[in-house]
UniProtKB/Swiss-Prot annotation:
CDD domains: AAK_NAGK-C. This is Acetylglutamate kinase. It catalyses: N-acetyl-L-glutamate + ATP = N-acetyl-L-glutamyl 5-phosphate + ADP. Pathway: Amino-acid biosynthesis; L-arginine biosynthesis; N(2)-acetyl-L-ornithine from L-glutamate: step 2/4. InterPro entries: AceGlu_kinase-like_sf, AcgluKinase_fam, ArgB, Asp/Glu/Uridylate_kinase, Glu/AcGlu_kinase, NAGK-C. SUPFAM superfamilies: Carbamate kinase-like (SSF53633). It is an enzyme of class 2 (transferase). Transmembrane segments: none annotated. One of its GO terms (biological process) is arginine biosynthetic process via ornithine. Gene3D superfamilies: Acetylglutamate kinase-like. It is found in: Cytoplasm. One of its GO terms (cellular component) is cytoplasm.
Length: 298
C-alpha cells in the first residue's frame, strides 16, 4: 500500500515546510472532530488518531472530540441477548437499551479514547452531555412512509448546548472527549446522533473547523470522483439528482448546517487513512471534501 511506503528525509522536511503556514494560521483555534468508523475499531488507527490529536494540541490547536460507538453498542446488546431494532436508520432505544447505550458510550468507549490520548502525552478528559446538563435534548420523532411522528424511545435531538464546561476544559489545557448523550427536561438520558452533536457543538464553540471521520473518501460524484470543495448550493444539487442519499444525508446535513452557521469549514475525511487529520489540516491538497458556508465551488 502507498501509505506503507517509506518517506524519505527530504519528503519529511517538505511536509513540515508545507504544514508551517497552516500551523500559524490555525494556532489558537478550536477544531471539533467527530470520531467514528474504522478509525475507532482498528488498533493501529486508534493509536494514530490519539497521536494526531496530541500533535494538534502541541501546535496550538484546541481539539474537541465527539465520538460514536455503534459497533460497540451492538456488541453489548448482543451479549445481553437484546436484539437491535432500527427505524429509518435510527436505533430504537427503550429504557433497557438506553442504560446499555450510556454505559458503552460514557463508560467503555469514552474512557478508552481518553486513556489512549493520555498515553501519548495528551491531557484528555471525558464528559457526557449529562455532565452539568450541558447538552439539553428533546425526543426525536421519526417520519416513516407508513406513519409520521413515530416514537422510537430515548432517542433525541439537540435542543441547546451550554459550552461553559467544554470551554473551561479547553482554557485549562485539556482535550474534551464528549459522549453524545443528552439530558431531557425531566433528567432522562437521550441517545443523540454523534454527527449532530459534533455539528451543533462546533457552531456553539465558533470552531474554525469541523472534521467528520468516516469510512469513505469524502463526497463523491456519480462517476466516483472525490469532490474536494463544496458549497451548500452544490450539496443541494447533489441531493436533488440522487448522488447523495441514505446514511450519508444526516452527516451531510450536520456538516452543511455547521458551515452555514459560522464554522469556517467542515470536512468529511477518510478515517481509514493513517494521519487523516494531519493530512487534511496541514497539506495544500488535503484528502477529503471541504464544505464552505458560502461562495463558489473551486
Amino acid at each position: 500500500m502507498e501509505s506503507e511506503n517509506i518517506i524519505s528525509a527530504a519528503d519529511k522536511a517538505r511536509i513540515l515546510a508545507e504544514a508551517l503556514p497552516y500551523i500559524r494560521r490555525f494556532s489558537g483555534s478550536v477544531a471539533v472532530i467527530k470520531y467514528g468508523g474504522n478509525a475507532m475499531t482498528e488498533p493501529a488507527l486508534k493509536e494514530g488518531f490519539a497521536r494526531d490529536v496530541v500533535l494538534l494540541k502541541l501546535v496550538g490547536i484546541h481539539p474537541v472530540i465527539v465520538h460514536g460507538g455503534g459497533p460497540q453498542i451492538n456488541a453489548m446488546l448482543e451479549k445481553v441477548g437484546k436484539k437491535g431494532e432500527f427505524v429509518q436508520g435510527m436505533r430504537v432505544t427503550d429504557k433497557e437499551a438506553m442504560d446499555i447505550v450510556e454505559m458503552v458510550l460514557g463508560g467503555h468507549v469514552n474512557k478508552e479514547i481518553v486513556s489512549m490520548i493520555n498515553t501519548y502525552g495528551g491531557h484528555a478528559v471525558g464528559v457526557s452531555g449529562r455532565d452539568d446538563h450541558f447538552i439539553k435534548a428533546k425526543k426525536l420523532l421519526i417520519d416513516t412512509p407508513e406513519q409520521n411522528g413515530v416514537d422510537i424511545g430515548q432517542v433525541g435531538t439537540v435542543e441547546s448546548i451550554d459550552t461553559g464546561l467544554v470551554k473551561g476544559l479547553i482554557e485549562r489545557g485539556y482535550i474534551p472527549v464528549v459522549a453524545p448523550v443528552g439530558v431531557g427536561e425531566k433528567g432522562e438520558a437521550f441517545n443523540i446522533n454523534a454527527d449532530l452533536v459534533a455539528g451543533k457543538l462546533a457552531e456553539e464553540l465558533n470552531a474554525e473547523k469541523l472534521l467528520m471521520m468516516t469510512n469513505i473518501a469524502g463526497v463523491m460524484d456519480k462517476m466516483g470522483n472525490l469532490l474536494t470543495k463544496l458549497t451548500p448550493k452544490r450539496i443541494d444539487e447533489l441531493i436533488a439528482d440522487g448522488t447523495l442519499y441514505g446514511g450519508m444525508l444526516p452527516k451531510i446535513a450536520s456538516a452543511v448546517e455547521a458551515a452555514v452557521n459560522g464554522v469556517k469549514a467542515t470536512h468529511i475525511i477518510d478515517g481509514r487513512l493513517p494521519n487523516a487529520l494531519l493530512l487534511e489540516i496541514f497539506t495544500d491538497a488535503g484528502i477529503g471534501s471541504m464544505i464552505l458556508g458560502g461562495g463558489e465551488d473551486a
